[in-house]
Amino acid sequence: MDHQEPYSVQATAAIAAVITFLILFTIFGNALVILAVLTSRSLPAPQNLFLVSLAAADILVATLIIPFSLANELLGYWYFWRTWCEVYLALDVLFCTSSIVHLCAISLDRYWAVSRALEYNSKRTPRRIKCIILTVWLIAAVISLPPLIYKGDQGPSPRGPQCKINQEAWYILASSIGSFFAPCLIMILVYLRIYLIAKRSHRRGPRAKGGPGEGESKESRPSPGGAPASAKVPPLASPLSSTGEANGHPKPTGEKEEGETSEDPGARTLPPSWAALPTSGQGQKKAVVLAPAEEEAEEEEEEEGDECEPQAAPGLPASMCSPSLQQPQGSRVLATLRGQVLLGRGVGAVDGQWWRRRTQMTREKRFTFVLAVVIGVFVLCWFPFFFTYSLGAICPQHCKVPHGLFQFFFWIGYCNSSLNPVIYTIFNQDFRRAFRRILCRQWTQTAW
């Protein structure tokens, strides 16, 4: 039988080149995600196993589905065995459904982590996450079985053998609801609930959260190291008021700033075991420990080990850049015109737990935001296809979209498999650092 190809030679070459790049990029990007989660110390959380499974599903789409879809698109007919057509259709539904059910499970995980933080985080073990992932794949497998069991009547085609999923209206609507619309509704409702919880928590403000460093100053007790157990942080002021040398006139000796008493009641008390560190210079206040090193995960520090240079901060005393006051590893410096406020690693067990908990909550918020972006992009990519697919089943005579537009929506859905690594790179600094470390290591090994 003479088959007429649907595209010209130039269009066929262009489409083949673009889709081949899509396949390679999808495999490379998602393999990088899996490698980053399994090898990086900054991505050890059990919930990241969801991302490993999701990346595996995207790799399977790129290797087992997209190449055959490309051949079917360019040839205009199904070139391969009939049995493989049935397996191909079932796998297509399986991987697409597993992706969205993964996102649905991730949404529920986010909700439980936000609404029942202490209770759920104690139960969120790798074993529990793996059981949830297995359940996700079983649900997707159940939804993908009908193409193997009931093939429907596809009828002859003038363009040769075709490989299409069941075209009956009941199956189209049932599969669209089960594979896309129902999970989407669950995700939207869950994330709406997460947003309301976060908004209510934000309204409460820091007073309701409590923790070290809040409340009135308590009597200092000596710590095991001999330093006072609590220290006061001087309130930050404007450059003019803080130096007492506005307009070039020094403040008279013994004159206090407005609102400042000898006991400095406005100063915040630091948690126990945070010792004060002296700075050089007569008139400078003591530098005090401000925050533990665990919080450095909240800041994006692209370069490490930078040394303090006097030229970089004109107007500051040179003593503040002396070797004795350089920032220790794992600490940060807040430099003001009053002096230098330096933090260190020495925190007590209770305070360390509080700060670790705060850092964990910050990462949870960032992770929730990144996954909201992932879900939003997934819905944007697949909604046009499922909407037009269902619309054709509801009113096939008057609502059917042109074939070219439908195929465009079909391929936009496949493109989603390559986007998650890009989203992680843009919105998550932990993944960004892990990707850079892996790629730089491979580049170094290749160079040598």
Swiss-Prot record:
Which cellular component terms (GO) are annotated to the entry? plasma membrane
**Organism's domain of life?**
Eukaryota
- Alphabetized CDD domains for the sequence: 7tmA_alpha2B_AR
Does Zinc show up as a keyword for this record? no
Compartment(s): Cell membrane
Cystine crosslinks: C85-C163
**Keywords attached to this entry:** Cell membrane, Disulfide bond, G-protein coupled receptor, Lipoprotein, Membrane, Palmitate, Receptor, Transducer, Transmembrane, Transmembrane helix
Lipid-linked residues (S-palmitoyl cysteine):
C440
List the residues marked with site Implicated in ligand binding: D92
SMART domains membership? 7TM_GPCR_Srsx
Kindly give the SUPFAM superfamilies that the UniProt entry links to this protein.
Family A G protein-coupled receptor-like (SSF81321)
Q: Which residues lie on this side of the membrane: Cytoplasmic?
A: 39-49, 109-130, 193-370, 428-448
What job does the chain carry out?
A: Alpha-2 adrenergic receptors mediate the catecholamine-induced inhibition of adenylate cyclase through the action of G proteins.
Subunit comment: Interacts with RAB26. Interacts with PPP1R9B.
The text of the family note is:
Belongs to the G-protein coupled receptor 1 family. Adrenergic receptor subfamily. ADRA2B sub-subfamily.
What's the protein name?
Alpha-2B adrenergic receptor
**Which source organism does the UniProt entry give?**
Cavia porcellus
Corresponding gene?
ADRA2B
